[in-house]
């Protein structure tokens, strides 16, 4: 089923501007409460100006451009502006530190980055000292320094015409984005996402929550994540709805924002639900227009029931990952919901439960959740410059191995059991155990290290590190946590430390993590 045809992202925005004109497309609220608003026509003009900015900066079709931004309208100007000229967005998690960000720049081969003044010192240091191709920094915000290799985004953009200066030939098979995501290996892999992927995501996700043009979709999720991009933004724009982007999540402010913008659809992760539940009760907390709350794993039955009863909402479960682009298993519009099932496969997808020999398992038996789609169309195209990793995860016939375990019942409802090996889910972020272990093992006093996820009532999982010290060494908690804070993003820093004489291992030398829980 081809529901996209030949419509690339450039054609999408030109059509949206023509069809919806002055209808509100994007509302952005900053952490200070400052609101910026754009119609479909004015947003398309901002996108065109940004595309022209990139053209004037020497960016051509096929070039990779990095974005390191918190939620802001400029993220969307850049995302779609790059797509209009056939260039490729490489979003970087705004919480990453220097070493992690430099690694993504190096492996994406991006020569230009758009970032905010907050992150300028880090990228100036990367430009001068690290082995990357980065040669230009474009800064968003006031007081950009007057230095070589630095430009001011708003000044340059506002000088550009509102119509596109050059429109290279585009195909829906062209790459629009490379999104680096944590994996079970020590480093992130770049998920290659095409124009077709993003157009399909818009149609699919708008179908999933039955979006209409009179809907208002509000999200607090970070724009550099796949769920904000494909479950929320692309869905809202494809349906002609209004998309409300909040700069940062605040449990105290959330329901006021939902009421203020008369949001009809939003999305939540467990950390949000738990922090909302501990807020003081308010007589206004049920006075909202929400008809659907898109929900992503994992929540107990008691937590789910309490949240629904208190706030008068219903949860629409959706299961997916960056590689699947959208929530390929979930509750369908008008379908019955069978908690704790994650739902059934959506249109254009097949799902199966496989054993270790890649054989299909019958209902009730636990195995690996596998998804069948079309690479570059309904699922990701490949891992960037990683053919071996691509071949391991993605079969030639389109079956994707998620690494997650689950089962299905006799009626075809699927159930999630456990996360992929060596991953920790922390407040909406995926954290690779191996990546943390490699960083921590560089400490001169540490001989052996393993990290695990342990239950956290607020943020899904906390991170606990078990270390074995070199003989004769001592290590304080202050020393350990200071080392971690200097070498990894804040959300990756372990919450707990246990120093042991040894770590449990099996006969092949692998650490037995279950013995540590």
Curated annotation (Swiss-Prot):
Keywords: Ligase
An annotated Gene Ontology molecular function: medium-chain fatty acid-CoA ligase activity
Broad EC category: ligase
Entry's EC annotation: 6.2.1.48
A Pfam family that the UniProt record links to this protein: AMP-binding_C
UniProt catalytic activity: 4-(trimethylamino)butanoate + ATP + CoA = 4-(trimethylamino)butanoyl-CoA + AMP + diphosphate; crotonobetaine + ATP + CoA = crotonobetainyl-CoA + AMP + diphosphate; (R)-carnitine + ATP + CoA = (R)-carnitinyl-CoA + AMP + diphosphate
Disulfide bonds: none
InterPro entries: AMP-bd_C, AMP-bd_C_sf, AMP-binding_CS, AMP-dep_synth/lig_dom, ANL_N_sf, CaiC
Keyword Ubl conjugation part of the UniProt annotation: no
Pathway in which the depicted protein is active: Amine and polyamine metabolism; carnitine metabolism
Entry keyword Ligase: yes
Biological process according to GO: carnitine metabolic process; fatty acid metabolic process
Family: Belongs to the ATP-dependent AMP-binding enzyme family.
Function according to Swiss-Prot or TrEMBL: Catalyzes the transfer of CoA to carnitine, generating the initial carnitinyl-CoA needed for the CaiB reaction cycle. Also has activity toward crotonobetaine and gamma-butyrobetaine.
Name under which the protein is recorded: Crotonobetaine/carnitine--CoA ligase
Organism: Citrobacter koseri (strain ATCC BAA-895 / CDC 4225-83 / SGSC4696)
Lineage, uppermost ranks: Bacteria, Pseudomonadati, Pseudomonadota, Gammaproteobacteria, Enterobacterales
């Amino acid at each position: 089923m081809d529901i996209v045809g030949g419509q690339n992202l450039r054609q999408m925005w030109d059509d949206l501007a023509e069809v919806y004109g002055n209808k509100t497309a994007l509302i952005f609220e900053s952490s200070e409460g400052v609101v910026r608003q754009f119609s479909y026509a004015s947003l398309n003009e901002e996108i065109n100006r940004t595309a022209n900015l990139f053209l004037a900066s020497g960016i051509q079709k096929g070039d990779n451009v990095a974005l390191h931004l918190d939620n802001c309208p400029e993220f969307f100007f850049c995302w779609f502006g790059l797509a209009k000229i056939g260039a490729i967005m490489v979003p970087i998690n705004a919480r990453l530190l220097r070493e992690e960000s430099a690694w993504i720049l190096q492996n994406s081969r991006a020569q230009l980055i758009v970032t905010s003044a907050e992150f300028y010192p880090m990228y100036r240091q990367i430009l001068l000292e690290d082995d990357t191709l980065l040669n230009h920094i474009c800064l968003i915000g006031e007081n950009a320094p007057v230095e070589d290799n630095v430009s001011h985004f708003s000044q340059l953009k506002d000088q550009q015409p509102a119509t596109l200066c050059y429109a290279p030939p585009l195909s829906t098979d062209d790459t629009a984005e490379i999104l680096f995501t944590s994996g079970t290996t020590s480093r992130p892999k770049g998920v290659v996402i095409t124009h077709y992927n993003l157009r399909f995501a818009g149609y699919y996700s708008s179908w999933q929550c039955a979006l209409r043009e009179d809907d208002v979709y509000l999200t607090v999720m970070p724009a550099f994540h796949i769920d904000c991009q494909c479950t929320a933004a692309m869905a809202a724009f494809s349906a002609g709805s209004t998309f409300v982007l909040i700069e940062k999540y605040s449990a105290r402010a959330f329901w006021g924002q939902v009421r203020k913008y008369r949001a009809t659809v939003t999305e939540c992760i467990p950390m949000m639900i738990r922090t909302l539940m501990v807020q003081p009760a308010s007589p206004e907390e049920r006075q909202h227009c929400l008809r659907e709350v898109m929900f992503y794993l994992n929540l107990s039955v008691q937590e789910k029931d309490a949240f629904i009863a208190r706030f008068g909402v219903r949860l629409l479960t959706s299961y997916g990952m960056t590689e699947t682009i959208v929530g390929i298993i979930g509750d369908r519009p008008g379908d019955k919901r069978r908690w704790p099932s994650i739902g059934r496969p959506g249109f254009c997808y097949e799902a199966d439960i496989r054993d270790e020999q890649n054989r299909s398992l019958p209902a009730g038996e636990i195995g690996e959740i596998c998804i069948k789609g079309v690479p570059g169309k309904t699922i990701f195209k490949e891992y960037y410059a990683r053919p071996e990793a691509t071949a391991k995860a993605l079969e030639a016939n389109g079956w994707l191995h998620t690494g997650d375990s689950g089962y299905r019942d006799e009626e075809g409802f699927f159930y999630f059991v456990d996360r992929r090996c060596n991953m920790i889910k922390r407040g909406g972020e995926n954290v690779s155990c191996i990546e943390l272990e490699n960083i921590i093992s560089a400490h001169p006093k540490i001989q052996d290290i393993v990290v695990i996820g342990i239950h956290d009532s607020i943020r899904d999982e906390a991170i606990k590190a078990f270390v074995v010290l070199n003989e004769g060494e001592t290590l304080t908690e202050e020393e350990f946590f200071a080392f971690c804070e200097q070498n990894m993003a804040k959300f990756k820093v372990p919450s707990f430390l246990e120093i042991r004489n040894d770590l449990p291992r099996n006969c092949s030398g692998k650490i037995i993590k279950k013995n540590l829980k």
